[in-house]
Every structure is written in structure tokens, then in C-alpha cells.
Amino acid sequence: MSMQGLWSYQRTSYIRRGIIMYYERIYGFDNLHKAFKLARRGKRWKPATARFEVNLLENLLRLSRELQDKTYELSEYHTFKVYEPKERDVMSNSFRDKVVQHSLCDNVLEILLRKNFLYDNYASRVGKGTDFGLNRLDGFMHKFYRQHGLEGWVLKCDIRKYFYSIPHEYLKRILEPYVPEEDVRWLLWYIIDSTADPGIPIGNQSSQLLAVLCLSPLDHFIKEKLGIKYYGRYMDDFYLIHEDKEYLKQCLKDIGMFLAPMGMQLNQKTQIFPLKNGIDFLGFHIYLTETGKTVWKIRRRSKGNMSRKLKKFRKLLDRGLITRESIHQSYQSWKGHALRGNCHHLVREMDELYNSLFKEDNKDVSITVESADRGESQVR
């Protein structure tokens, strides 16, 4: 049977008598194939990806069978350190496990959890993300200014070693009401318990959604019990804007007490400061002018991160481990993000580095700041 024929044979609506069969969504062949293509994106040059793709049909059928029979076993994690934006231990799983993660998260977990998430919860959400979160903060600051001018305060919070402090039993307890099928719970519990307790691996796709869920009760507490109108969170980085400094001090105490039973605590970067100082969020420093305009400035460390990344790309390109097109896409994505702020000079410096590193194979794709963004506003 051809692969197309097999897809047609295995394709299903995953619905029985009006009941959605969530676990079948995970191991269904067509969904696993879609998950493979998502896991492969940007990683085709890696040997592990190539090895899996050589025997694609066999590997996908084996995964489907193992998940269906519950004989699926996670491969051993590969642990390494990353130093940007801060030092962290990342636990990366094998390519076949990444395929399972995509199928689990994209076809089941995100669908089951999204109704519980607060609107201003931006990480790992379809239709949300960093741009959405930045625009919401920008809008909040404009609205606050119209009501109170610059006379406001910000409580900026960050949780100490967030991923490493999430207790497994607490996570399972808040997950259970949203996961109706025992088979799906089996897979989730297996993944959660695959590392030491407390803590979940940063490298897993499922960990991102689970980490978003873990603080969802805190989101509702801040919005509904504390009554904070201007609030946003991206993973464990969140802010509260209010006109009363003393009330934010009380909020800080209440948030600390709310987190304590979970085994979590706010880190030393948590602070209360005047709104006129501006807010660091998602790589930008956003502040209000005296006339109520917002100004965005990208943080300088973003330049250093991209500079190191481009130099690494040059080495990978020389070894034939990455394509010229993928480098260009990555750089243009960073530049599009950077150009949202008042940082055209910084981007020009990065253009010079980019063109110097890839000048021999960059003649047809180089885009300058002027041609890419003639109409971009620096002040909003």
C-alpha cells in the first residue's frame, strides 16, 4: 500500500457516538505524520532528523503501535546548559519523542487546556506569543495614562527557578479535571514523572504548556481576587500596574502566600517601581513619555545573542549542516522583532555583521533597515 493510501486508510474523525477520542488523536497515523513535519521544521540538517526520515513509514507506524499498546518508552534525555537569556539546564529528548510531544500538545493538550487560560497569558498559546504580549502591555500603558497620567506603579515579578520547582503531584492535581481520558493521563503522568520531582524538563514541548497551566490559578487570583485590571504574564514573568503603591505591596505579600503551598517563591528580581521608569518585558524596555506616547527599546543583550547565533550559523553553513535559507529566515525574524522598537542603529550594526559573515552568498537576499522598514514608527 502506498503512503498516501495508508494515510487515507488510517484517517479518522476521532469521534465515537459524539464523544471525542483524544488518545486516538495522539497515535493516529495522519496526526503523527503532521507532528513529524512540525518536529522536523528548522532541523532537517540534524543527523537524528535524517535518520528518522530515512525509515519514516516504519518509524511512524512503530510509534503509533507503541502508543496504542502503551509500550512507548521515552529515550534518555540529553542535558546541556544554555546561557541566554540566563544560565539554565535544558533536557532535550530524542527526535522520535519530539514527534510524540507535537502530537500530544497540538492535537490534545492545547485544546483541553486553552479554555482555562486567562486572556492575558501569552506563552505557548495559539494566536498569542511575544508580539501579542508586547502589544497588550503597550495598550495597558496607554489606557492607564489616560486615567492616571504617569502617577502609577508597577509590580514586576519573576519566579525563582520556575521549571525546576514545579511539584509533580500538584501539576497532576490541577491537570486531572481537564483530561477526561485515562489513556491520555497515562501518557502525561509518564512524561511528568520522567524527571526528578520537583521539576519538569525545559526542553519538552509539553513542559511549556504544563508550566503555563501551573500558574493559571495565580492568574485568576490576581485578576479576580486582587482586582488588578492591568496584568499580563509570559510563563513566569508577569507584571501588575496600579495607581496605589501600598496596594501593590499588599499584592506582593498575597502572591508570595499564594505560591508558598506550591513550593514556589518569587526571586530577587521582583520589585515595585514607578511606571514612569518603564517596564522590561519580552526583550523590550517600554516606557511612557510626558505626553502619553509609548517608546519601545530593544534590550542590548538581544544584539549579543543574535551576534553569537550568526557566528555559529557561519560555522554550521561551512560544514554543510544548515541551509542558507534557514539562516536568512532566522535573521529576518529577529530583525522584524527588533525593528518594532526604537533601535534602527542597532539593527544597522547587525546588518553589517550579517553581510560580512555571509557576503559571498548573500547578494540576492540582503535587506537593509531602510528597505525592510521605511515606515516603522518608533514612538506610539
Please give the residue ranges for each predicted region.
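Right-hand nucleic-acid polymerase module
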Residues: S2-L6, N93, K98, H102, ...
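Non-catalytic, well-ordered alpha-helical scaffold segments
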Residues: D30-H33, L57, L61, N93, ...
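Active-site-proximal segment of RNA-dependent polymerases
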Residues: Q4, Y9-R16, Y22, N107-Y164
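Non-catalytic, polymerase-adjacent accessory regions of viral genome-replication enzymes
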Residues: M1-L61, E370-R380
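Short coil/turn segments at secondary-structure boundaries
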Residues: A48-F52, L74-K81, K115-N121, G149-K156, ...
